[in-house]
Amino acid sequence: MTKKSIIISIISVICLVGIAAFVMYGCSGGKENEEKSGASGQITVISREEGSGTRDAFVEVMGITDEKGNDITADMAELTNSTSVMMSTVKGNKNAIGYVSLGSLSSDVKAVKLDGVAPSTATVKDGSYKLQRPFKIAYINAKLTDIDKDFISFIMSKQGEAVIAKEGYISTEAKEDYTGSGKKGTITIAGSTSVAPVMNVLADEYKKLNPDVKIEIQESGSSAGIESAMQGAVEIAMSSRELKEDEAKTLKSQTIALDGIAVIVNSSNTLDALTSEQVKNIFAGNVSAWEEVTK
C-alpha cells in the first residue's frame, strides 16, 4: 500500500468515527431533550362532559370561552362523565391532560403547577391558586322535610365542617354545634360527581348519629342534579359550580366548601408546570403537540 493510500484510509476512518459520534450524540441528545420536555407527540385532551359543574367552572376560570361566554373546548377532546373516569383515562395515556377536583386527586396522576403555584388546600384558601370553585347544595326550601333540614344543619355545623376539612376541602366558618340525634326517614340527593365523595362521608357521619336515616346519593353531574331538585325528583342537589340565574330563581343554595381544580397529566410526564395561557390554548385546540408547549 502506498503512503498516499494509507493517508486516505486514515482520513476515511476518522470521518466515519466522527459521523458515528455525531449520530450517537444527536440521538442521545434528542432523547435527553425529550425527557426534559416531559412528553412528545400529539396532546390527548381529556375533558368532562357538558353539564359537568367541574367543566363549567374550569372553562370559566381559565377563559376557554368566546366573546359571548360560550364554552370553546376543542371538538377533538375526549369526554369523560365522572372524576374517577377522568383520572383513569389520564393514568392510561402518557400524552393525556385533564382536570379533576383537588379533593379527589390521587397519586395515579400528576398535578402540575399553574402559573407557578401548586394546587393545595393552603393555596386555595389563601387565593394564590386561582383555579377554584365552590361546592354547593341547592334545594326548594318549601319542599324540605324536617329530616332534610336536619341533615343540612349537620353539614353546616362544626361537626360537618370538621368532616369537610378532613377530606381535604376548605370548609365554611361554622358557628354552631350539631345537637340532633335519633332521626328517622329518607333523604334523596343528586348531582356533582366531584361533591359526591365528601357528601358520602358526611352522610356516613350523620348516620352514625341517626342510624335510622337512609340517604340516597346519585352521581349525575351538577346540571342534572340541579334539574332533578327543580323538578322535585330529589330533595337536595349537589353542585360544583354557582347556580345560573334561572336556577337561582327556583332553588336556594348554600356553599358547603371551596375546592381547587387540579390540571393533571400522566405520571410519566416530567412536565411540572403550565401557564394559564398554555392551558387555555391546549383545551381550546390551539396547541396540539407537546413540543409546542415545551419549546
Language model feature labels by segment:
Residues K4-K295:
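Exported/periplasmic ABC-transporter solute-binding proteins
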